[in-house]
Each structure stands twice: as structure tokens, then as C-alpha cells.
Amino acid sequence: MTAEKYTFPANYGEFDAVFREYRAIFEKQLRTVCDSFCDNGAKYKALYDAASYSLEAGGKRIRPVLAFEMCRVCGGDINNAVPAAVAVEMIHTFSLIHDDLPCMDDDDMRRGRPSCHKAHGEAVALLAGDALSAYAGKYICDSDLPAEKKTAMIKELYDRTLGMIEGQTIDTDGKFDTLDGLLSMYEMKTSELLTAASVMGC
């Protein structure tokens, strides 16, 4: 984990201010992570440029913020929630890259700019999503957390990732016989990673 040390926001009187401070912590750490991709070598530059392109595209960062706040509620050290925040956002970003591909939703735009496959090509985008899925677990493994905490985090992360993928499978099939079935699909696609962020942060 990075040598950078963070502290919880001092004032909890205004939600928007706390949210912004959590986001600022996350964005600073994410910049460090994306910079570290350069260490993987020039021959993988296209892969990690695409991964960084999507990771740094913005978004609300609800999942990292949730990990930080659950850590605070549980009385933890925010620095121990950083691996959870980064890993969950990597998985979320991988899912968005794949979701935008022509074989899925075929979306040309994501967060106000060309989607990953439009900017970097379909093959590289597919591999960038795969790389982020793998890197999420690696990031936790490489952290300074105790071994048992790493194991618990990784299990939670990939259990929930599988649930998210199963939800996307239902969406791809496009057959919803009942409202409950439709809601179940949305629940799996969205709530699985929100749950992961909450559990991993605590």
C-alpha cells in the first residue's frame, strides 16, 4: 500500500462536504495507482493506458466513499479501507468497460467521452477490463493488511463480482417474465458491489 496516510474528515455536519473529502482521498490514491501501471513495462502501455483512461473517467465514486464511511462507522483506520475502495472501483470500472462493448450494450459514450473500446479499440478494451478484474485482487494482496483480512476481502470481492456478472447475464438474455425478475436483475447488477464496498470497508 502507498506510504501516503489519510485521516477521516474532521467535520461530519455536512454530507456534501464529507462526500467531497472522501472523493478527494480516493482520487489522490487512484492517481498513484494509475501512475504505478507504468512499472509494468512499455510493451503493455496500450493495455494500461486503456485501464487508466476508464478508471480516471470520473463518476460519483459511491463505492469507494461507502467503503470509507463504513470503515469510520465500524471504528476502523481509513488507511485500511483504501485497498477495498480501490479494488471495488476497479471491478466496477471493468464491468463498465465490458458493458459498453458492441457485444453487450454497444455504447459509444461513457461519462461524457468516448467509451473505452471507442478510444482504444475493442480488443484492448476487453483486455483492459480483464486486467482491472485481476488487478483488484492483486492490489489487495500487495497491501499491508493482515493476511486474514486480505483473504476475507478477496473472498467478499469476488463473491460479489460473480453475482454482478450473473446479473449482467440475466440482462443480456433480456427475458423478464415478472417485475420481481426485473428488479432482481437490477439488484444483482448494482447492489452486489455496493454490498462488497460496505463489507470490505468495515
Predicted regions: what they are:
Residues 25, 31, 41-202:
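Mg2+-dependent prenyl diphosphate-binding active-site environment of isoprenoid biosynthetic enzymes
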Residues 1-34:
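N-terminal amphipathic/basic leader segments beginning at the initiator methionine
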Residues 12-20, 36-41, 55-56, 126:
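Short, N-terminal intrinsically disordered low-complexity segments that are rich in Pro/Gly
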